[in-house]
């Protein structure tokens, strides 16, 4: 008697585990030429880290103004900041260059929305391990699955913001007035 088996092995899609996010949110208390002292918002702990290397590698985005909220990627053992982004300057209403009447709003809670017609409908934004990430769906309704784009911050200050979205550079100016901060 001969017996055979045809067991099919189930192939599962294996995804690489996502790198844990080491970004911390802080309130800047003091700044010198090479270090920042801040209050870590979640732990209420005061820390000081060097940021000179981050500045040399263009990983400091925004003005370092006392009292502002920053997103910092720390290396605590080495007492260094790998990346610093001024979240207080990043949030708000941004209008794209070119007088097209289009732009976006980035809220402090991570919500993002478009202003005017756009090729994408923004859902949220986040800073993860020093990267600016926008989550969106195509505006034409062709696909309702959220997509994310790990963008590069080119420059940021209280009035101007340049970044990439899907490899294209976007330049914005901040709008301030009665309904904005």
What are these regions (language model features)?
Residues 6-25, 31-122, 133-181:
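Lipid interaction determinants
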């Amino acid at each position: 008697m001969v017996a055979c088996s045809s067991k099919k092995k189930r192939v599962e899609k294996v995804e690489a585990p996502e790198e844990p996010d080491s970004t911390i949110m802080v309130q800047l208390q003091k700044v010198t030429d090479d270090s920042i002292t801040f209050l870590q918002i979640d732990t209420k702990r005061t820390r000081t880290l060097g940021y000179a290397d981050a500045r040399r590698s263009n990983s400091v985005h925004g003005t370092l103004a006392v009292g502002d909220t920053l997103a910092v990627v720390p290396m605590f053992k080495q007492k260094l900041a790998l990346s610093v982004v001024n979240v207080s300057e990043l949030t708000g209403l941004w209008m794209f260059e070119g007088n097209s009447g289009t732009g976006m709003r980035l809220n402090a809670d991570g919500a993002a929305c478009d202003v005017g017609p756009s090729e994408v409908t923004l859902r949220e934004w986040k800073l993860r391990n020093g990267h600016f990430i926008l989550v969106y769906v195509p505006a034409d309704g062709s696909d309702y699955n959220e997509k994310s784009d790990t963008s590069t911050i080119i420059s940021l200050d209280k009035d101007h913001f340049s970044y990439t979205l899907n490899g294209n550079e976007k330049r914005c100016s901040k709008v301030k007035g009665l309904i904005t901060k």
